């Protein structure tokens, strides 16, 4: 196991099989990205109301979204990287709205599992520094995302 993943289900509705799917998929993504062993990440499942509150507070957008990531290694202006020898690398937090995942699965006509996996990988790649603000960045991130999902078996039908 490469990643230590701390799961929190604030909805109390996520089935064990879905948590296991996300666990296996993120382990696969970590392998594809050559992440060092004992790296930590947290995944929290929330409702649309909760993610809307987070989106409003941290992004200034008063609406629900599907996934938000908080990268602990992302440095702000003037900040210096601090590392502690012998301590595990902590990537950050992935927060997924299961309500939005269900809505989007229906909207895009694919399974809840595929959407949940997509959102987990999308959030994970953000923790690693991938972004999609510029067209070239988007191409790189979405290509990597598709590769991970496809090789895991959750590609588009």
Swiss-Prot record:
The keyword Cytoplasm applies. GO terms for biological process: rRNA processing. PANTHER family: ENDORIBONUCLEASE YBEY, CHLOROPLASTIC (PTHR46986:SF1). SUPFAM superfamilies: Metalloproteases ('zincins'), catalytic domain (SSF55486). Zn(2+) binds at residues 122, 126, 132. It is found in: Cytoplasm. Belongs to the endoribonuclease YbeY family. This is Endoribonuclease YbeY. Gene3D superfamilies: Metalloproteases ('zincins'), catalytic domain. NCBIfam families: rRNA maturation RNase YbeY (TIGR00043). Binds 1 zinc ion. One of its GO terms (molecular function) is metalloendopeptidase activity. InterPro entries: MetalPrtase_cat_dom_sf_prd, YbeY, YbeY_CS. It comes from the Bacteria. Its cofactor is Zn(2+). Its main location: cytoplasm. GO terms for cellular component: cytoplasm. Its EC number is 3.1.-.-. Single strand-specific metallo-endoribonuclease involved in late-stage 70S ribosome quality control and in maturation of the 3' terminus of the 16S rRNA. It is an enzyme of class 3 (hydrolase). Keywords: Cytoplasm, Endonuclease, Hydrolase, Metal-binding, Nuclease, Ribosome biogenesis, rRNA processing, Zinc. Pfam families: YbeY (PF02130).
